[in-house]
Amino acid sequence: MFVIKRNGYKENVMFDKITSRIRKLCYGLNTDHIDPIKIAMKVIQGIYNGVTTVELDTLAAEIAATCTTQHPDYAILAARIAISNLHKETKKLFSEVMEDLFNYVNPKNGKHSPIISSITMDIVNKYKDKLNSVIIYERDFSYNYFGFKTLEKSYLLKINNKIVERPQHMLMRVAVGIHQWDIDSAIETYNLLSEKWFTHASPTLFNAGTTRHQMSSCFLLNMIDDSIEGIYDTLKRCALISKMAGGIGLSISNIRASGSYISGTNGISNGIIPMLRVYNNTARYIDQGGNKRPGVMAIYLEPWHSDIMAFLDLKKNTGNDEHRTRDLFIALWIPDLFMKRVKDDGEWSLMCPDECPGLDNVWGDEFERLYTLYERERRYKCIIKARVVWKAIIESQIETGTPFILYKDACNKKSNQQNLGTIKCSNLCTEIIQYADANEVAVCNLASVALNMFVIDGRFDFLKLKDVVKVIVRNLNKIIDINYYPIPEAEISNKRHRPIGIGVQGLADAFILLNYPFDSLEAQDLNKKIFETIYYGALEASCKLAEKEGPYDTYVGSYASNGILQYDLWNVVPSDLWNWEPLKDKIRTYGLRNSLLVAPMPTASTAQILGNNESVEPYTSNIYTRRVLSGEFQVVNPHLLRVLTERKLWNDEIKNRIMVDGGSIQNTNLPEDIKRVYKTIWEIPQKTIIKMAADRGAFIDQSQSMNIHIADPSYSKLTSMHFYGWSLGLKTGMYYLRTKPASAPIQFTLDKDKIKPQVVCDSEICTSCSG
């Protein structure tokens, strides 16, 4: 039996050679648990005549990955095999890879079709010796197997469908794409990215340095006008943004309701549902980022709109397809008055914006005055109990996980962009709160800090966190200036207001590394101090940039220009970790370069790349299933697996018990200290999660993607959570509602072959916000 080598030559299969290759990659791993011969034997079983060495490496990596539940070092070995394979298939020098990408010729038409931009190529040519010399390829081997596979699938650039970039090449491309001729800053950014201190958002990783360097994640639009022209002009904007890999939030509260008169045609409106069907089909038609993910939009509506009940049914699995838009996400922009009426079991008037104009343009007391005026003038379409609408909201959430909920008054009251006008919607992932109008499309550029990295020698390094945040602020400001904007209205907005969004990933990992239970007082205190540090560092860096380049155009009249920062709007006094008053004085003197700074986003894909838990979330399970080409296998929380292995507590019985219990360790006989630290989201009081969101909210000047997890949701449970979040002043009340399946098959045995652990969804619904 023979294999085909990379050079095309045939060679007889040699077991010892396969074993030797695997053994070479086991350096530094626990040899008591890692068995190269076992891996090699399984590889031999999968061999066929004419198999390539590339295919052998791929198989060996997958086999090693399937052994991860035996020892965490198998995951490292799997990644090393896969990355070593890539290194053998790609050029080493960064400059040569960039040349290949620039010199690409389309094989179908013979035309020069560069993948990277001419300016990127010019910079690389000028500084190639320096750039080539600072890249450290060993850092590629720090990715775990699934992080690397995520990069391989969507992030590393290809020529004729063959990957040509290594992870380090990608990171240097991103750094050079952002900083261009400022080569020292590019190298600083490269090192921080490759050491995993932070990551830029997916669109930045996809597109930095390329010919279409669209690096922004989020776009927020208002419907231009309640007319055919306005609706279709807005649709075109959405299509152009979606084409360039942007996630969209769209407010439609100004579109007239069904049954309303249309004076131009002397007809009757069909309302928002047929219009949204058109938007739904546009989202389906456009594949963002060259099939890296499908087009996605979140549609925002205020609950006084008389089409609200039909809107709440849009994503349901049953019902007439003519009244469904299952490819759009639905979201509510809820005024406080509605919550008060629900709380008091009051009546609620449903209105048409054509007959009751201006409700979407006002908030707070002004909204209440206008709304109650329209009620007194009997301009409403109908009156129903507020709780009827509320019940429909809860039912939709239990069935579909949506609508997302944001509180209009909190979003406007606590926004540093309040001086611009009324904010009417958020984005696709509910963490961006920015002003938009008919002439401006709000944009946000994102990055996320890997909090686990800052746990050094058993303590959290706040000073290092602040320093990294300051680099991120400088980077995101450069992105604003050099970005390719899909539409001019987005460029106008972004350069006037200069908002950015700094988020986090690995909060749960940081707590685990410090041995803090997620719901402990220590974790709750650290949660506040982390976000206080991020906000402080971001303000400090933005003020420094303003000193050099001037404040953003619309700074005058903002809260910050009057010495009011986010925590002041929450009536919170910061800790004594940082000295706030001198910073406020500096801001009064020089201003800020950015209107907004902090926005914890979901980090779905980038957290997987870096091997961290997502965003600010606790772990949802301690064991889950991954799907690969060779089949399915189980992955255990790596922190748990390591501690159990070190304490000689890991065995098949424990593994099977965790699988039977859906990823929980609470029913095992493990020590109590381990049980406390490794609680899943389902075992942590949801009100603690919401309280921690409010605690950090005082230092988040945008908002945060906050999911609500209720294993078995009911009207009363979900209502209680929503009203608790609203009462604490949250801007985002809920991103998704996450639930457990209604029933699970009865487990009659602990036989691992008969146990179905939680399957991780590999959907990339919100890659655009994965910072």
Swiss-Prot record:
GO biological process: deoxyribonucleotide biosynthetic process
GO molecular function terms attached to this record: ATP binding; ribonucleoside-diphosphate reductase activity, thioredoxin disulfide as acceptor
Pfam family, one: Ribonuc_red_lgN
Entry binding sites for GDP: S202, S217, N427, E431, T603, A604, S605, T606
Annotated residues for binding of ATP: K5, R6, E11, N12, V13, M14, F15, D16, K17, T53, D57, K88
Cofactor (UniProt): Mg(2+)
InterPro entries for this protein: ATP-cone_dom, NrdE_NrdA_C, RNR_lg_C, RNR_lsu_N, RNR_R1-su_N, Rrm1
Reaction(s) the record says it catalyses: a 2'-deoxyribonucleoside 5'-diphosphate + [thioredoxin]-disulfide + H2O = a ribonucleoside 5'-diphosphate + [thioredoxin]-dithiol
Active site: N427 (proton acceptor), C429 (cysteine radical intermediate), E431 (proton acceptor)
Described function: Ribonucleoside-diphosphate reductase holoenzyme provides the precursors necessary for viral DNA synthesis. Allows virus growth in non-dividing cells. Catalyzes the biosynthesis of deoxyribonucleotides from the corresponding ribonucleotides.
The protein, known as: Ribonucleoside-diphosphate reductase large subunit
Organism field: Monkeypox virus
